[in-house]
Amino acid sequence: MVGTASSFFGVAEMPRTRYIAQAGVIAALYAAATLITMMLLQGLAWGPVQFRISEALCVVAAITPAAIPGLTVGCVIANVANMVISGTGALGMLDVVFGSAATFIGAVLCWRLRKRPAIAIGCFVAANALIVPAYLPILLQGLGFYTIPFTDISIDGAYLPMYLFGVISTGIGEAVVIYALGLPLLTALKRANIAPSS
């Protein structure tokens, strides 16, 4: 039987005020952590090779459904802030829309697969690795990059090689952060009994 949208997103599983409060805290933490990562790691927080340390927080989607809107809104805030700070203008909207969609998809799948945490958190790796590289060549060309970073492959007419490079590089960066930082965080949250029962 198909449930309602509210049960699909876990709203029915906890009091509404708690759900909204958790989502707000998660959004604020994710946005702040992403902006701090941007300031400290600069180019490694955005682009074809990413180590967005804040992605470690995505694992909370395995313990609370409030992470679905929380991470999505946090990602929107961080990507809008990056668009303003970096001056990407309208091109930055690609990241706001599609990068946030990748986070949303990863969060929904992670929540749905939460009984298998190691697989569940991998949903963020898959979503980001498949979606972000699809618009990255357009964004990079608009910012004045004409070759695939770290190679001599021209972006012009090389969409498929650029996409494949992005799948690998974005996937590796996401996997390192999710599994090296996020999985221990998830384990610690569960041990500290911070995770609500699901």
Regions flagged by a language model, labelled:
Residues Y30, L71-N79:
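Small-polar-interrupted transmembrane alpha-helices in polytopic inner-membrane proteins
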Residues A21-A27, G70, A102, F150-I155:
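Short, functional N-terminal and low-complexity linear motifs
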Residues M1, A12, A23, D156-A158, ...:
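Short linear sequence motifs
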Residues G70-L71, Y179:
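Non-catalytic, surface-exposed connector residues within folded enzymatic/regulatory domains
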Residues V2-T17, L186-S198:
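Short, charged juxtamembrane terminal tails flanking transmembrane helices
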Residues F8-R16, T72, D156-L160, L164:
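Juxtamembrane loop-helix boundary motifs flanking transmembrane segments in multi-pass membrane proteins
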Residues F8-P69:
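Hydrophobic transmembrane alpha-helices
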Residues M38-G47, V76-V97, A102-S198:
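Membrane-embedded alpha-helical hairpins and interfacial helices in multi-pass inner-membrane proteins
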